[in-house]
């Protein structure tokens, strides 16, 4: 989150480019008209080359910042299942995904500007030392010192900072939080929030106060550099539009963290 004397600004991001085989899971064209950053799938957890390319073109047309949404090589499980990689293998797969996406991005008039791990990888590197280090090594090997979008307090953030990479602290508009600041498992009731009004007010609170109400009603303090709105959630576009409207009504602008 950035501030001036008279206003606040917050980055809104969404996971996009996840269509495989012509079966869309999100309305990417509509989402890039709302968000300021797009986490674009790289073909490992989801997405095929043509769909990814179309999403990149739409992002470029709307001046939306592009990030590589790297994930485990598991389309069948949508990248939401833990895989016990060797560190070298994981680092290579992360580097491969960034490079492939950047090649497509440049052909569509944009480029990869940051990295956000997906799903099980994202959650694993909150606490898993070996995988956290490997993911950061893969990102660093790309050579562009790309910022890394992570859950606040993640072990991976320590490795990123040691590697000289900027850490973007991410909060989730539509996900429930445990009191310790981790995300409630999707297997639990109430893990995903669906009421646009509730979610919109929550995002304003994140931006203005830097706090989130946990699932037990307690208050969590956090740093919100970027807020994620899931593009594949039911009613994702309507929710993103409501969030944008609520931010605007509270004099909070939507803008990239870069």
Swiss-Prot record:
The gene is pxpA. It comes from Corynebacterium jeikeium (strain K411). One of its GO terms (biological process) is carbohydrate metabolic process. Coiled coil: none annotated. It catalyses: 5-oxo-L-proline + ATP + 2 H2O = L-glutamate + ADP + phosphate + H(+). Keywords: ATP-binding, Hydrolase, Nucleotide-binding. Belongs to the LamB/PxpA family. This is 5-oxoprolinase subunit A. The keyword Protease does not apply. It holds the Pfam family LamB_YcsF. Catalyzes the cleavage of 5-oxoproline to form L-glutamate coupled to the hydrolysis of ATP to ADP and inorganic phosphate. The keyword Hydrolase applies. Its EC number is 3.5.2.9. Forms a complex composed of PxpA, PxpB and PxpC. GO terms for molecular function: 5-oxoprolinase (ATP-hydrolyzing) activity; ATP binding.
């Amino acid at each position: 989150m950035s501030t001036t004397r008279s206003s606040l600004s917050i980055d809104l991001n969404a996971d996009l480019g996840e269509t495989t085989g012509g079966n869309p899971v999100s309305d990417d064209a509509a989402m890039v008209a709302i968000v300021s950053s797009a986490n674009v799938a790289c073909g490992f957890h989801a997405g095929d080359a043509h769909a990814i390319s179309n999403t990149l073109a739409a992002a470029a047309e709307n001046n939306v910042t592009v990030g590589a949404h790297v994930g485990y090589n598991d389309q069948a499980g949508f990248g939401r299942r833990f895989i016990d990689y060797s560190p070298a293998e994981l680092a290579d797969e992360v580097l491969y995904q960034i490079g492939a996406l950047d090649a497509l991005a440049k052909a569509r008039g944009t480029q990869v500007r940051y990295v956000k791990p997906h799903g099980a990888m994202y959650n694993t590197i909150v606490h898993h030392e070996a995988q956290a280090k490997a993911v950061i090594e893969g990102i660093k090997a790309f050579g562009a010192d790309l910022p890394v979008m992570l859950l606040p307090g993640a072990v991976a953030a320590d490795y990123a900072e040691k590697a000289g990479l900027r850490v973007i602290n991410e909060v989730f508009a539509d996900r429930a939080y445990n009191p310790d600041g981790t995300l409630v498992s999707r297997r639990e009731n109430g893990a995903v929030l669906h009421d646009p009004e509730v979610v919109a007010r929550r995002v304003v609170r994140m931006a203005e106060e830097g706090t989130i109400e946990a699932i037990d009603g307690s208050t969590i303090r956090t740093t919100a550099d970027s807020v994620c709105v899931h593009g594949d959630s039911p009613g994702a576009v309507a929710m993103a539009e409501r969030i944008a409207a609520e931010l605007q009504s509270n004099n909070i602008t939507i803008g990239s963290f870069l």
